[in-house]
Amino acid sequence: MNAPHTATLAAETITTLVKKRWGGDFVLLAAMWGSSFLLMHISTVEFGPLPTAAMRVGIAAVFLFPLVWLNGLFPDLKKHWRKTFVVGILNSGIPFVCIGFALLSISTGFSAILNATVPMFGALIAWLWLKDKPSASRLLGLLVGFIGVAMLAWRAAGPGATLKASASGAAPIWALLACLLACLCYAMAASYTKRYLSGIPPLVTAAGSQMGAMLGLALPAAVLWPTRMPSGTAWLAVIGVGVLCSGLAYIVFFRLIENAGPARALSVTFLVPVFALFYGAVYLGEAVTPWMLICAAVIVCGTALSTGLLKIWR
């Protein structure tokens, strides 16, 4: 299978996915979250991990709150604030800080690859907590997706790789563990949302979670605020990640959980590395090799199986 063929297969699979009732949200969310690694890297270098995370959720909260008010959803937000606070800590507060710390040592592409372990955590938690037992085809999809991610990770960390985890080519263990902790928190938040916030408007969950995370991070971020004023580029990056990757993206994410379930919603992270690698090539000059395209096709096939788009066994 040559690179052009795999690229065509990936494009066709994504196009088919978009035609699903929730497929458009699935691909859109992957594209938005794929850009978050690039934007967080730019902002974290100057703001620091914790202030960047606080700014991200704070900007998202400021963006979302007027929408809640204009849509007459403030009573719902007030009623469910405790539950959305928990979601905010699990789905934004802890993960954003962990990823910010990791991005100081590993590349954006490598961190996005690690982020693709979320569906594995999500399927396990949904199975144990929500009794959402995956079918054989969906289990195969998780395995195929994991293989695609492993292929990318092997090439990224191996000798002569274009995506180095650090200047020495070795990813610090704490950075890897931080990313995995973030993935575990994402998975827990998705199942918590499905169990306790089903039927709640996605805008309410998105706004409440970002406000909760903002409250949790505000004080430590103020203590660790940089003494030197960050550049305009860093400010634009943190505003972009707040509005696009948190404000708008979480509306799409919670709507996807409602329509497709937490396990399928979390499978979006199989596509995130594909977009992250694309953005890295365009904006950071990282090479996109035929091997990356082959891995992308494997990941997309895994996504199609794990979300039920393709079914091998009933």
Model-inferred region functions:
Residues 31-40, 65-115, 151, 242-260:
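Specific transmembrane alpha-helical segments of multi-pass solute transporters/efflux pumps
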Residues 2-54, 101, 160-195, 314:
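Glycine-/small-residue-enriched transmembrane alpha-helix faces in small-molecule transporters
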Residues 64, 125, 134-159, 163, ...:
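Hydrophobic transmembrane alpha-helices of multi-pass small-molecule transport proteins
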Residues 18-22, 46-50, 54, 76-82, ...:
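Juxtamembrane helix-entry segments on the extracytoplasmic side of multipass membrane proteins
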Residues 2-9, 21, 46-94, 121, ...:
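Transmembrane alpha-helices of multi-pass small-molecule transport proteins
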Residues 64, 122-124, 128, 159-224, ...:
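Transmembrane alpha-helical segments that form core, pore/gating elements
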Residues 53-55, 92, 96, 109-117, ...:
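Helix-helix packing/entry segments at the starts of transmembrane helices
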Residues 43, 52, 56, 102, ...:
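Hydrophobic/aromatic residues within transmembrane alpha-helices
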